[in-house]
């Protein structure tokens, strides 16, 4: 893992805090499929299944969060030399003392992508 640099998440975090509780449970099929044992609540914005050539679906979190998410995504993209696109985007809310354990992602989309984690706190 390497540190890319600073990313201003002020606007994204403020927008996130304004969202209704139901948004955290809106896309449960992805939570069950991708991290069934993780004790987190998740808002999914974008999901690409089947590899980077496949279409990217906008999920429930996209409409309320995309305007605040776009500057974060653009800043992250600025750390890479070649232009790409966001294949997956999600926000995970972990409980006190919880973390995401080190793991290996698999599947055509994740194997072809850079995974970037931006801590909100």
Task: Report residues per predicted region.
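Catalytic core of non-heme Fe(II) oxygenases with the double-stranded beta-helix
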Residues: 73-121
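Non-heme Fe(II)/2-oxoglutarate
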Residues: 1-82
């Amino acid at each position: 893992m390497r540190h890319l640099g600073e990313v201003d998440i002020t606007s994204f975090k403020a927008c996130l805090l304004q969202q209704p509780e139901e948004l955290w449970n809106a896309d449960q099929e992805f939570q069950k499929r991708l991290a069934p044992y993780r004790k987190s609540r998740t808002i999914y914005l974008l999901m690409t299944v089947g590899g980077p050539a496949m279409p990217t679906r906008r999920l429930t979190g996209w409409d309320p969060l995309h305007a605040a998410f776009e500057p974060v995504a653009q800043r992250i993209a600025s750390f890479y030399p070649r232009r790409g696109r966001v294949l997956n985007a999600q926000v995970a809310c972990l409980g006190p003392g919880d973390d995401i354990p080190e793991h290996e992602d698999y599947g055509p989309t994740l194997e072809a992508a850079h995974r970037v984690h931006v801590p909100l706190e």
